[in-house]
Amino acid sequence: MSANIISPRLVSRVWGGERLAALGGSGVATPPIGEAWFGEIGSQNQPLVKLLDVADRLSVQVHPTDALAAELHGAGSIGKREAWVILDAAAGAHLLLGRDPAVSADQLQHALESGSDVAPLLAKIPVSAGDVLDVPPGTLHALMPGLLVWEVQQPSDRTYRVSDWGRSSSERPLHQAEALRAVNVAATAQQVARVDWETAGTRTMITNDAFAVTVVVGPWSESMQFPHGAIATLISSPSMSGAASGPAGRVAGLTLQPLQSALITAGSVAMEIPHGSALLFASPP
């Protein structure tokens, strides 16, 4: 067998919702459930994939580069680059990502240093199902309510909160000093790519030194090469029946239901993807 189905680990989050409980999986999580993890922190040569059910605002936050993580947390610590594929979005949904181009880097730097609210200084990006966004380390961001997100990231949990919308909890401290070191005030919003649901085939959506994101849109019944440690997640077209429902697909002989994921353990992967479905692959660099 060249793939294994991953049992997700459900994680409670103050901003989570109700859509991930049906995935089952390992661990004990009490509602609201915000994340389903396919992989673990610290995995070697393997990205971490998560599903995020965003019912409330996430904190305004930033992640460090590998170099800064090692400086602040010790040798061997890594930063956190991530990317998002929007699987479902409520009407009018948006997110915050990078400095608003109408705001100068000096204005953002001053707000960070003074402890002012930086959320109004960030780019407000409307999103819909199928949008793909890259989030380099150093880029301020916040996911907003009404989103179901497939996230791929480096296997690190280094997150520096700049603000948390007035929520006060010892479990959710702010990290002003670290954030000041981490934020790249020059970073503006990255261009939004989109999954083309009308054209069957394969397309690499994002590639960088941390991971690659590839989408294979059905109908598709060919094999492809992927490195050991790649993770595949089946989703359904939002125009069909939504990301969380729809027909099953097959990868490396395994049947995957929508939102199930499999770990690829060998190079050549046979796939059977029905019309209206796609496989999202997160691969090591």
Language model features with spans:
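Ligand-binding loop in jelly-roll beta-barrel domains
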Residues: 54-57, 65-67, 79, 89-92, ...
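His/acidic/aromatic-lined binding-pocket segments of jelly-roll/cupin-type domains
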Residues: 49-50, 58, 76-77, 82-85, ...
